[in-house]
């Protein structure tokens, strides 16, 4: 495991014989049934609630602002490599609903309140945010400007 991966993930806390979730990469000519996952962990979160609702388990995960900036209602997030849909969001946490099959086939089945998890946000959102901020990095000669202020200055808004 690369040093950057150790720094950004829960791997530092892994114990001998502890399970991890591994999934094969999607083939380029296969059915696209989820969101684009690069396998690059953006940060970690902590499960703060786990509740059964009918046939689903609802997990609520607390995450740092650096991750929450990319978490949107009905958007996608990967928890320990498992692609899921966000059903609720607050400033510091989000919730996902997991079906029994997913719980049985992944390490989330043994996750409990307090479990630290790896999080990866949707790569499309990361690219959009990056491109929206291009040219707005502050320098001595040029103070930081938002994309909105640039659009207004140039007559687009």
What are these regions (language model features)?
Residues 1-157:
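Conserved loop->alpha-helix
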